[in-house]
C-alpha cells in the first residue's frame, strides 16, 4: 500500500518503511507522529482519491532526526551599482520513517507518542510551587514602602529634515516618521536586520538606502 501525503506545503508519495526528509516538525528522536493530510491511497484493490483529503486515513511516521540540510549560496548582484551580496542558507528539516499507513475504518497498530511533551507538563506545577513563596516574601515589603514618584518622561529628540538624504522626498520622509525614524542618528545606526524590517512596511526602502548610502550620509549629517 502507498499513500500521498501533504505536510509543510509539499506532497510526498510514501510506503511503509520509507525514509523521507520533510519540513521541520516539533519533536524528539523516537517520537511517532501523524504526518498530515492524506490525499490519496493506493493498494491492490485500487486507488482512492480524497476531496481534497481522505477522512479517516492516517500516515504514521517515526521521527529519526532533525537537522539542517547542506548550505545553499544566495548571490545577488546589480549591474553598474557596485552591489554584490553573498549569503548562505541551511534549511531545517526532519527525517522520518513511515511506520504505518492506516486506511479509513481500520485501527492504527502504532500509537502516537511524544517524548518531549509529557515532561514539560509535569515540570510546570513544580516550577510554579517553588516560585510562589518568593513572590509572597517579596510582596510584603513593597506594600510598606511609599509609592515611588513617577520619573519625568525623557524629552523627545528634535526631528531632523530627512529629506536632506538623497532619494528621500516628503512622502517617504512622512512614512519614515510614522515608523518612528525622525533623526539622522537613527538612520546612521541602522543594521541589516533593521532595513529588512522596515522594508516590510515601506516597499523598496532597503534598496534605496543601499543605493544612496544613507547610513554613511546620515552619520555625516548627524555630526
UniProtKB/Swiss-Prot annotation:
The keyword Cell division does not apply. Residues 133-147 have a biased composition (Basic and acidic residues). It holds the Pfam family Ribosomal_L21p. GO terms for biological process: translation. Residues 110-149 are annotated as: Disordered. InterPro entries: bL21-like, bL21-like_sf, DNA_repair_Rad51/TF_NusA_a-hlx, Ribosomal_bL21. Keywords: Ribonucleoprotein, Ribosomal protein, RNA-binding, rRNA-binding. GO terms for cellular component: cytoplasm; ribonucleoprotein complex; ribosome. The keyword Phosphoprotein does not apply. One of its GO terms (molecular function) is structural constituent of ribosome. It comes from the Bacteria. Belongs to the bacterial ribosomal protein bL21 family. This protein binds to 23S rRNA in the presence of protein L20. Part of the 50S ribosomal subunit. Contacts protein L20. This is Large ribosomal subunit protein bL21. It comes from Maricaulis maris (strain MCS10). The gene is rplU.
